[in-house]
Amino acid sequence: MSSAKAVVGSILTGEFRIRPEDMKPGATLADLNIDSLTVVELIEAVGQELGVRISEHEVTQWHTIPDLVATVEAKLAQRSAEPGR
């Protein structure tokens, strides 16, 4: 399991009270009752935990938890590829 997946899962279960069994790969954010306000809170929590910044444009591409995790993993990879890291 990637660190991004673990952190996102931990935030969703801990802060947003989403049950792990509900976080199936095909479940949409709407299936999990994650609305636009919750997405903003989720972005902030993930950003603080992993030190990544996610734009509103990137958020509009999310439909499932794997979409969210893929965005976070890409951000982490991009950050680690920067000179001086």
Features from the language model and the residues they span:
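Phosphopantetheine-dependent thiolation modules in NRPS/PKS and related acyl-activating systems
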Residues: M1-L32, T38-I43, Q48-R85
